[in-house]
């Protein structure tokens, strides 16, 4: 686990990101997209995916997504910024989210 506590790794991955782009990337490049904690680093994301899903990770790319400005009646508000991780799996590895159903 390369020095990360198991408790911290359980808090790094928040949810899989299911969208048109995520599905396209998964089919084309053997990548999986996750919504991760805003304090997460690439090594933490790699260790968390390997621990939770028992797969081998080739690389991790992280993108900071800016929150949108939204209106609530007369008031304007802003959604939180969040972080998205593109996890590239080694050949032959696969994460199937539909298997739990």
Swiss-Prot record:
Could you say which residues form the signal peptide? Answer: none
Which BP terms in the Gene Ontology apply to this protein?
A: translation
Is Ribonucleoprotein there in the keyword field? Answer: yes
InterPro entries this protein is in? Nucleotide-bd_a/b_plait_sf, Ribosomal_uL23-like, Ribosomal_uL23/eL15/eS24_sf
Entry keyword set: Ribonucleoprotein, Ribosomal protein, RNA-binding, rRNA-binding
One Pfam family of this protein, by short name? Ribosomal_L23
Q: Which GO terms describe its cellular component?
A: ribonucleoprotein complex; ribosome
- State the SUPFAM superfamilies in the record: Ribosomal proteins S24e, L23 and L15e
UniProt lists the family membership as follows: Belongs to the universal ribosomal protein uL23 family.
Its quaternary organisation is: Part of the 50S ribosomal subunit. Contacts protein L29, and trigger factor when it is bound to the ribosome.
Q: What does this protein do?
A: One of the early assembly proteins it binds 23S rRNA. One of the proteins that surrounds the polypeptide exit tunnel on the outside of the ribosome. Forms the main docking site for trigger factor binding to the ribosome.
What HAMAP family does the record tag this protein with? Ribosomal_uL23_B
- The identity of this protein, by name, is Large ribosomal subunit protein uL23
Q: What is the lineage of its organism?
A: Bacteria, Pseudomonadati, Pseudomonadota, Betaproteobacteria, Rhodocyclales
Q: Which gene encodes it?
A: rplW
């Amino acid at each position: 686990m390369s020095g990360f506590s198991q408790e911290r790794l359980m808090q790094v991955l928040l949810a899989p990101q299911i969208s048109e782009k995520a599905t396209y990337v998964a089919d084309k490049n053997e990548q999986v997209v996750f919504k991760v904690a805003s304090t997460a680093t690439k090594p933490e994301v790699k260790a968390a995916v390997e621990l939770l899903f028992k797969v081998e990770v080739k690389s991790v790319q992280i993108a900071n997504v800016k929150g949108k400005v939204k209106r609530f009646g007369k008031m304007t508000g802003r959604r939180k910024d969040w972080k998205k991780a593109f996890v590239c799996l080694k050949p032959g590895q696969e994460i199937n989210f539909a298997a739990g159903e």
